[in-house]
């Protein structure tokens, strides 16, 4: 069981709190279950834990779902995602789940109502719940058709009592809060694997690890390329210079094979004119232009997160 939850004492009137961390986790997966970056024994995840009253549950759940949909939509994965309402198996309560049937029925009815109110189209997964409560899993299929969970939002009805977490309501009565456990992008390694699959390695410019590569035609152009590259780097772009003594055709082919979004070819004419000659990996030659003009093109693509 994986659980990272920090608890702390609060004033009794404090009835909503949220805690979060980005951490490295370890899970002893069977060797036959491991698969590339999709299922690994060591992974990184950003988690949030929201401690709240029952009447806050729906609004907070909605915010968690909106956050996950925004993140997945921004990176281009949401369109292929499906939603699964993961429930307990009442026939197998003692081996996997904690809590009473009444607690589970209540938690699942609350979640069902929330999903209905939010108009979420989902399937039901029996025996897929966490040991402490039901959850909404955002699922994604890999290129082989196998479905994995990208993001999960869990309603926890049990751990607050175990950790001695209570709040005092408006009537002065001691009550147990709910806890929502949520992620926004899920396991980084798995999400990265699906991004690589989805884009066939050609990640959009705004998320590409290398956005621009300068390709000097001759050694005479290397210093000019380095000066121009430094200007882009200073603006926050990820830029390299190919200083190898190779023919320009090979440099272009290598950059294409490595799926570099923009290649800036620089020859003697560019040095004399103070220009660069950009190529896009999909659109080809864009024609000679000043570095400022190219920067404007790059800024538009990156700032608007265009899928090119």
Predicted regions and their residues:
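Generic long, charged, amphipathic alpha-helical segments
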Residues: 199-253
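A translation/RNA-centric and nucleic-acid-associated enzymatic feature enriched
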Residues: 17, 21, 25-31, 126-202
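C-terminal structured "cap/appendage" subdomains that terminate the fold
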Residues: 229-297
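Metal-assisted phosphate- and nucleotidyl-transfer catalytic regions
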Residues: 73-153
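Conserved alpha/beta enzyme-core scaffolds, especially Rossmann-like or related mixed alpha/beta domains
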Residues: 39-101, 126, 206-214, 233-234, ...
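Single conserved hydrophobic/aromatic residue that forms the stacking wall/gate
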Residues: 1-11, 15
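Residues forming anionic-ligand binding surfaces in small-molecule and nucleic-acid pockets
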Residues: 23-55, 81-88, 163-178
